[in-house]
Amino acid sequence: MTQYLQDTVEAIAIDLVNPGICHFVWKACDDVVFEHIRSSDFIAFINLHKKAPIPIIKDRRAGKMCHVLYELSLCHSIPGLTNQWIEHMLVALGIDNETYQHHHLIKPNSLGTSKSNKKFAERIQEAIKLADIINL
């Protein structure tokens, strides 16, 4: 993590991504995209809290995790830190930038998108919308 990103997160003492959004995304991904972790641990990881455990991505699920990171990056409370946040997440999760560039954008209405990926992308978008509706 860059020093600037860490200093900014600590100085403002707010979450980069709304914990409610993180929780609903966690519900859609837990034990599907990554091995089971507690919701609070996922929220802490996404918001760069110190000593947060790193989710263990399941085999052949890195592409879906890239999409999750992309969708969460659209919800950042400080958009100017988005690229640094994504870079940090990729390094922490052991995902290379090429994989992210290839998989981050899953378009549910695209002809080339698999049925599984369409369903997954819709679940993530629904989770984010639900958190917004509930206004957590």
Language-model segment annotations:
Residues 1-136:
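Flexible coil/loop and intrinsically disordered linker positions at secondary-structure junctions
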